[in-house]
Amino acid sequence: MDKFRVQGPTKLQGEVTISGAKNAALPILFAALLAEEPVEIQNVPKLKDVDTSMKLLSQLGAKVERNGSVHIDARDVNVFCAPYDLVKTMRASIWALGPLVARFGQGQVSLPGGCTIGARPVDLHISGLEQLGATIKLEEGYVKASVDGRLKGAHIVMDKVSVGATVTIMCAATLAEGTTIIENAAREPEIVDTANFLITLGAKISGQGTDRIVIEGVERLGGGVYRVLPDRIETGTFLVAAAISRGKIICRNAQPDTLDAVLAKLRDAGADIEVGEDWISLDMHGKRPKAVNVRTAPHPAFPTDMQAQFTLLNLVAEGTGFITETVFENRFMHVPELSRMGAHAEIESNTVICHGVEKLSGAQVMATDLRASASLVLAGCIAEGTTVVDRIYHIDRGYERIEDKLRALGANIERVKGE
């Protein structure tokens, strides 16, 4: 397995170009299964999960090509099963189910894999599809969905806010007969992006970005060209990198209005932040950040995917800060690893109490999930001495060329190929 070797401390400064959002690209790739004409998707990040999704679409019979943009022609899809060998590494595969059953009347997906953070069950996806008229069976490790004729529009009240299930229901409802209303829908920018992609293909959707999405079913979806929005979590990660190293950064190809909660906390930490239409700059003026209190919650509140990075910020900040995680259980696996580097933290149920220290020291640490591993790499950039981050395949699932981008900001980082 590959590792990163990071030599610190360095001040990170310069410019970084933000990639397309993984969490929008993946649902959009699967939503392309609904289209009866070719689609072109631009600004798709080069990531392991994206490659796996493209491979899966090919196995279903779609023609998939990448030359800058990703081109998908799903006219000849003739396989309706997403097999275990592809699904086991990536939970996003469940998003194939809604489009398959909506367009072809049948679909089956092996139960998914992915990061190990907490319970992320597929029950909300299943109950949503059942309410649209699909028959669901769980057999031999597969979720099997079928319907005679078309799905039927329904009024669906989500038990809890779920980005994944909102995507599944919204995609399936585009080809259902009649109107579907999703109440307590997720409001994330990536949901809005997926909806806008579907609208480009001819879907009738309104209310995306609010907690009530209305979908009027249409008979078919055509083709089109669509550009994936910038990755707000990658943007936030690089802003934190500059903040903890007392540096200065400009993030290009960003979308500031998707990051309001994160930018507010960075300002509280003492960062000087400016935004333009598609850029964000942060300048610490050489100062150490101040500790901040953070509580994660569904959008538009503070995103859980930025929690590990802000835990790190607090651990090197002036003062004591509290980080409370309300979205996923079991999402503090980075804290013991940061403690190995000299961080002072206590975990009390779903809160980390962070006591800022002047400096961290390099150590051998292990990545446990995608965002936690990014925080360990950033910690290595500012720690004194050498840090080796093991199991970085987690990072490759969500960050495009993170070592190249950090190196361009002045980091001393190299990838060590595993045996």
Curated annotation (Swiss-Prot):
- Grouped into one coarse class, the protein's main location is cytoplasm
Q: Which GO terms describe its biological process?
A: cell division; cell wall organization; peptidoglycan biosynthetic process; regulation of cell shape; UDP-N-acetylgalactosamine biosynthetic process
Residues that, per the record, bind UDP-N-acetyl-alpha-D-glucosamine = R91, R120, P121, V122, D123, L124, K160, V161, S162, V163, D305, V327
What Gene3D superfamilies does the database record attribute to this sequence? Answer: Enolpyruvate transferase domain (3.65.10.10)
Q: What is its EC number?
A: 2.5.1.7
Q: Which UniProt keywords apply?
A: Cell cycle, Cell division, Cell shape, Cell wall biogenesis/degradation, Cytoplasm, Peptidoglycan synthesis, Pyruvate, Transferase
Q: Which residues bind phosphoenolpyruvate?
A: K22, N23
Activity regulation (record text): Competitively inhibited by UDP-N-acetylglucosamine 3'-phosphate, with a Ki of 7 uM. In vitro inhibited by covalent binding of fosfomycin and the fungal product terreic acid in the presence of substrate UDP-N-acetylglucosamine, with an inactivation rate constant of 102 M(-1)sec(-1) for terreic acid.
Enumerate the GO terms in the molecular function aspect: UDP-N-acetylglucosamine 1-carboxyvinyltransferase activity
Q: Which residues carry this modification: 2-(S-cysteinyl)pyruvic acid O-phosphothioketal?
A: C115
Q: Reaction catalysed?
A: phosphoenolpyruvate + UDP-N-acetyl-alpha-D-glucosamine = UDP-N-acetyl-3-O-(1-carboxyvinyl)-alpha-D-glucosamine + phosphate
SUPFAM superfamilies xref list? EPT/RTPC-like
Decide whether keyword Kinase is in the record: no
A Pfam family annotated for this UniProt entry: EPSP_synthase
Q: What is this protein called?
A: UDP-N-acetylglucosamine 1-carboxyvinyltransferase
Q: Which gene encodes it?
A: murA
